[in-house]
Design a protein with these regions (language model features):
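Residue-level signal for mature regions of secreted extracellular proteins and peptides
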Residues: 14-15
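Membrane-proximal alpha-helical signals and transmembrane carboxylates
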Residues: 2, 8-9, 18-304
Length: 304
């Protein structure tokens, strides 16, 4: 086969793949987000879809939702409620149910992966505990979560649910500002943290490179770029272009106060060894071999 013909064939194959073997995207149900919740012992699943039949300007959405004994059943029933064939290729957000644990994350992550693999742009959050109406709230939840990602340079991909066998870490949505962070251990209790501690956990997990949070009891806001390196169990936190914004007539050593809070947050995050969320045990074993005693993790803060 000649090179031009081979290129033409590849182009046709790619077009058929994107269009669903000849069916145009305009004729399909395009899924943008999937939300899960648990209600009275059952699962609820909501599909947020692009509404291609509206004549309004801008992006418009519609929803399909259902309840089931399992998450898979609820999702399948929501899919069956739609007249067209579903297209998951543009799915870029999934929300796990509030209060979920590691087993839930694995089950739902596998279900989503089967639908949307490899889904490189798919982001994962844990939903908040508010009582949401899917029809009324799904679109705003989607827009809010994507806005949090942009503002805080935050991203937890679907694949991050499966990178460790002892736990996973996922940002948790909150309606007011910022985000919480869920540490879901396979053999321990799930831990949810907020504020500076949540953003430090996200940085240690490689899910953000920015701190933008209040500290010192709400007296100031810190905005800084973050990079994390490690030498054995010593974690080096590199802070660049750091800006402190006092929220009142305060005259404090903001750098010292931030360092104190970061050290306290780090100690709290690393006190529970139910799972190696920050890969400290992994790197120590790689350096010193299995069975070597793990030193107490230490945080070194470097302003650059």
């Amino acid at each position: 086969m000649s090179v031009p013909k081979a290129k033409a064939l590849l182009t046709v194959c790619a077009a058929l793949l994107l269009c669903g073997c000849g069916q145009a995207l305009s004729e399909r149900e395009i899924v943008r987000a999937v939300f899960f919740a648990r209600q009275q012992g059952a699962y609820s699943a909501c599909l947020l879809l692009a509404d291609q039949n509206t004549e309004s300007d801008g992006v418009q959405y519609k929803t399909a939702s259902a309840r089931g004994d399992t998450a898979a059943q609820a999702l399948h029933l929501a899919e069956d409620a739609l007249p067209g064939r579903l297209y998951y290729g543009l799915l870029d957000l999934a929300a796990l149910p509030p209060g979920c644990d590691w087993a839930d994350a694995q089950t739902l992550g596998t279900l989503l992966y089967d639908k949307a693999q490899p889904a490189p742009e798919l982001s994962v959050f844990v939903l908040d505990t508010a009582d949401h109406s899917w029809a009324a709230d799904a679109a705003s939840l989607y827009e809010d979560m994507k806005a949090v990602e942009r503002e805080y340079d935050l991203h937890c991909g679907l694949q991050q649910l499966f990178t460790q066998t002892d736990g996973c870490a996922v940002p948790a949505y909150r309606a007011d500002s910022g985000y919480d962070f869920a540490l879901l251990a396979a053999d321990g209790a799930s831990v949810y943290v907020s504020g500076l501690q949540a953003q430090l956990a996200a940085a240690l997990c490689g899910q953000t490179d920015r701190f933008f949070t209040a500290f010192a009891g709400g007296q100031a806001v810190c905005d800084t770029r973050v990079n994390v390196t490690a030498e054995d169990t010593t974690v080096q936190l590199h802070l660049r272009d750091t800006d402190f914004q006092p929220l009142g007539a305060y005259n404090e050593d903001w750098q010292a106060l931030l360092c104190t809070e970061l050290q306290q947050a780090f100690s709290a995050l690393t006190a529970d060894d139910a799972a190696d969320f920050f890969h400290l045990q992994f790197w120590h074993v790689n350096l010193w071999g299995p069975g070597s005693a793990l030193p107490v993790p230490r945080l070194e803060i470097l302003f650059e």
